[in-house]
Regions:
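Divalent metal-coordination and catalytic microenvironments
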Residues: 37, 75, 87, 122, ...
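Active/binding-pocket-proximal capping segment
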Residues: 241-255, 414-447, 482-486, 494-498, ...
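Asparagine-centered strand-capping/turn motif at beta-strand->loop junctions
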Residues: 77-81, 227-231, 410-415
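Extracytoplasmic beta-sandwich strand-turn segments characteristic of Greek-key/jelly-roll folds
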Residues: 56, 60-67, 73, 89-119, ...
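Signal-peptide-cleavage-adjacent N-terminal segments of secreted and extracellular proteins
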Residues: 17-80
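Cleavable N-terminal signal peptides of Sec/SRP-targeted secreted and luminal proteins
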Residues: 3-20
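Extended terminal and domain-junction accessory segments
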Residues: 20-36, 132, 136-174, 255-418, ...
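Acidic-aromatic/histidine active-site loop/patch
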Residues: 157-222, 228-231, 356, 364-365
């Protein structure tokens, strides 16, 4: 443990040097938020079915982190899982940490992430980024409040709504059983739902009517719902019976108002919507409908108006029954609240996504006929620091050596399933999506496209994105349907080594040695 103390010192020293100082309006003084998390296994029954979950501070979902723009976060992770772990703040750049490319935190060790949220706001989440731990419960909401929120005067309260598919089997067992999406046993809203215990395996401990999540509304008040899809595999349609919604945020970025009835939300995506409590005082169903081929009942919660009697089972009245034409959010109509002139592209890549058996008969993901092969003995960053060459094909590594390059990436999906993909360390403009195996460049929106960190590649279709290479590092791009990380649907983008090898060498050398202890 003596060596670990030295290792920890260098993390704190380095982060204090490089974290930027934010500039804020309205006289807000940034502060340091000390977050203390213990990751451990606890036996719980969120839907009435008892099983062991991996939890944050014994809670499922984990505690919400709420800070303000400009604040510093010191997030200490104590690992008591009995296995290694790592934590990722999804959607956050996390400048001042090892970001995504870190070695794991061994069992019975602790690690402190130290970063400043200088220029990001909005709805995010944190989750384990080791094997399938977040499927077992290691996740929670991370909210960055904005002192200059342009919509602040238009809602009275905020409510966090976390959606997820849910398995009664430990995720590590699931991983051994499949490398394709699995039908979940249930779905939860804020960690709650009922389950039909007649479907539980013999010998299981299960209680019917475990109870639904309950959200308190006051007549005529307006609510900002921060909606997060923390699923392993499942996309949803989110709605509240009799209440329409106005979208104002997507993945931490403000949008122009978009009035809808149902919100399609894919894995790892986040939205904020404003809902007005303008219906008669009563109880209403909040619902999250599984998309596509998953034949499970709607996930439900209760919206309870102040003054209404308690009702554990409000009457079902979905938009599909009450309207002949209801409006689902079309992501193509999303526009940033403030227009942004985007630069012209200077480099272009096209990636064809396939899934087929490799030479050993195992189904793998291939990007341009190459499948990512991790080098356990020589991690990516260690290769960079030691000036080793890359086998770019087997590593699925793409190297950018110029600061400020404007990169277009086209993803062509030959699979009959959609893929929500995420880029670490970057946000990107979504220029367009479509069907077929060829990008229609005439249809690309280069005038005022939405910016995101998680977007959907359509089934048998394509997506075109653009970003500026301005964040040095080794970053992963991967499908956020978690089983595809083990096929693996993953590749690495490497940005201008000369800007970070000398600064990071000692820091990551300690991480590498610690991993080998």
């Amino acid at each position: 443990m003596a060596f670990y103390g030295i290792f920890f010192f260098y993390i704190i020293f380095w982060t204090a040097v490089v974290s930027p100082t934010p500039i804020l309006n309205r006289g807000y003084i940034p502060k340091t938020n000390n977050i203390d998390f213990t990751i451990e296994k606890v036996t719980l029954a969120p839907d009435g079915f008892t099983r062991q979950l991996s939890t944050v501070n014994g809670q499922f979902p984990g505690p919400t982190i709420e800070v303000n723009k400009g604040d510093r976060i010191l997030m200490k992770i104590r690992n008591k899982l009995g296995e290694s772990t790592a934590m990722h703040a999804h959607g956050m750049l996390q400048r001042g940490t090892p970001w995504y490319a870190q070695c794991v935190i061994p069992d019975d060790y602790e690690f402190t992430y130290n970063f400043t949220v200088a220029d990001q706001v909005g709805t995010h989440w944190y989750h384990a980024h080791e094997t399938m731990q977040y499927v077992d419960g290691v996740f929670g909401a991370l909210i960055i409040h904005d002192p200059d929120d342009p919509f602040k005067s238009e809602y009275d309260e905020e409510i966090i709504v976390m959606l997820n598919d849910y398995h009664h089997t430990n995720a590590q067992i699931l991983l051994k059983q499949f490398l394709t999406p699995e039908i979940p046993d249930n779905g939860l809203i804020n960690g709650k739902n009922n389950f039909d215990c007649s479907k539980a395996p013999p010998g299981s401990k299960c209680v019917d009517n475990a109870g639904l999540a309950k959200f308190e509304f006051v007549k005529d008040k307006k609510y900002r719902l921060r909606i997060i899809n923390t699923s392993a595999f499942s996309a949803f349609f989110f709605s509240i019976d009799k209440h329409d919604m106005e979208v104002i945020e997507a993945d931490g970025l403000y949008t122009k108002r978009n009035k809808i009835h149902r919100l399609p939300i894919n894995v790892a995506q986040r939205y904020s919507v404003i809902v007005t409590a303008n219906q008669p005082v009563d109880n209403y169903i909040m619902r999250s409908e599984f998309q596509k081929t998953i034949n499970l009942p709607n996930i439900k919660a209760i919206v309870h108006y102040e003054g209404a009697p308690d009702d554990p089972e409000p009457k079902d009245n979905p938009w599909s029954d009450s309207l002949t034409e209801y409006v689902d959010l079309d992501h193509k109509t999303l526009q940033p609240l403030e227009e942004e002139k985007i630069p012209e592209s200077t480099k272009k890549f096209e990636f064809k996504i396939d899934f087929h058996k490799n030479s050993t008969g195992v189904v793998k993901a291939f990007l341009n006929n190459s499948s990512y092969i991790p080098d356990i003995n020589f991690p990516t960053l260690d290769k960079i620091f030691k000036k080793k060459s890359f086998n770019e094909t087997s590593a699925n590594a793409y190297i950018f050596d110029k600061d400020g390059e404007v990169v277009d990436m086209y993803f062509i999906n030959s699979d009959d399933g959609e893929h929500p993909f995420h880029i670490h360390g970057y946000q990107f403009w979504v220029l367009g999506t479509g069907n077929g195996d060829k990008v229609d460049e005439n249809e690309l929106n280069t005038h005022n496209p939405i910016k995101r960190d998680t977007a959907t590649i359509p089934a048998s279709g394509w997506i075109a994105i653009r970003f500026v290479s301005d964040n040095p590092g080794a970053w992963g791009i991967h499908c956020h349907m978690i089983c595809y990380r083990f096929i693996p649907f993953l590749f690495i983008i490497l940005f201008f080594f000369d800007k970070f090898t000398n600064i990071f060498f000692l820091y990551f050398h300690f991480i590498f040695v610690l991993r080998g202890m």
